[in-house]
Amino acid sequence: MKNDENSVNLSRRDFFKELGMIGGGGVLLSAFPWLQSCSADDKVQIAKEKVRIGFIGTGSRGQYHLNNLKTIPYADVVALCDNYPPHLKEASALYPKAKTYDDYRKLLDDRNIQAVMIATPLYEHAHITIDALHAGKHVFCEKSMAMTCADCLDMYNVFKESGKVMFIGQQRLYDPKYIKAMEMIHAGLLGEINSIRAYWFRNNDWRRPVPSPDLERKINWRLYKEYSCGLVTELATHQLQVGNWALRMLPEKVAGMGDIVYWKDGREVYDSINLIYHYPNGVKMTYESMIANKFYGLEEEIMGSKGTMEPEKGKYYFEDVEPAPGIMQLINQIEHKIFDNVSFAGPSWVPETASVNKGHPISGQSSVGAAGDGSIELVTAFCEAAITGKPAPNLVEEAYYSSVLGLLGLQAIDEGRVITFPDEYKIPYLNFA
């Protein structure tokens, strides 16, 4: 493959065409069943209809989705709900014709609404989702699913019984770059996967401006254990899903540590965590996140016997780099001290320094939290599914396990012990089927 990113970057539509996902294709359905194409009849139905959406939770992530919905021709936002007036006012400016509510239950009573999208704080996800499904609505809920494993399981069970569509906001499942990366991994490009290292580093305090002290916990809910699980649910769940996706199996146990290392400002959730997930085949996924240094950013480093994949950077690297021709190879070997030095009285060795090869680009583009990370593709797929009434196979299962694994990681940190995946929270999927 030519090492030129501009030559391989594809438009999202061209990318999905390449994978056979548009126009009745199904090349990757066995590996990525949530990407199944619409039938010809489905496409006719989608072209003729609009799904009427009630949107619950109009803060920053909510408004991001609301802006994206404007670009989807078969999405019609007819109602908005938030119990924080400034956010509701901002959302109303985007959709001035939409009804407004300060109580989500009143929105659910509106029979004109076919589907709801939920972008509230984490502690509200479970009960709003369950109430919406009971009200006969299709549901899109932001990740993570819930604050407890029991609530995640309740959401899953109600969804399965409802006959409705449910999507969870795991956008990497629709990110063309990640899809292409997984196609390459599952085809054996990297050889046998033997380790995964994932991390997400930021440098900010997670605080939002508070107009009044009595609103501190409402606005800065991410910092308090009553409302938030911190880094494991806000960040880690994205990357845990990627690890499971790459290995096509689920870890059996987890150990971890966490502390408030830097932001000693009265917060209750950790600002630094380290986790180790152990898979049945012996592979470990290590995860680290902190919010006091952003130098390394975020990545999932998927390491195999033949190479390494970095899907967030859009690169993969082979272990054995093709040698440079002639004199350039000799110069490189001398400069990098490839030849062993034999000392007079001591061992002969060469340090295992990191590889300096530039790697090869993966097709597609991504930018976390912005257009191009799979978010708009995910919401588009939800709108299509809400019109046809056909759920995306295995999407909720992927989201369920990433949510529960994050919560088990937090339990391992809090209790200071290795946590084995509890049987009562296993649902039939992958190696837990």
Task: Show the residue positions of the predicted features.
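N-terminal secretory signal peptides
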Residues: 1-11
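Beta-strand-loop-alpha-helix segment that lines the small-molecule cofactor/substrate pocket
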Residues: 121-122, 126-174, 188
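N-terminal Rossmann-like NAD(P) cofactor-binding module of classical short-chain dehydrogenase/reductase
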Residues: 116-117
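Predominantly a Rossmann-like dinucleotide-binding segment in NAD(P)-dependent oxidoreductases
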Residues: 57, 61, 161-168, 172-267, ...
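C-terminal glycine/acidic-rich active-site capping loop/insertion
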Residues: 210-220, 231, 244-246, 253, ...
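N-terminal Rossmann-like dinucleotide-binding module
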Residues: 22-95, 175, 243
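Conserved SAM-binding strand-loop segment of SAM-dependent methyltransferases
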Residues: 99-103
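Stable alpha-helical structural segments in soluble proteins, enriched in small hydrophobic residues
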Residues: 88, 370, 374-378, 405-416
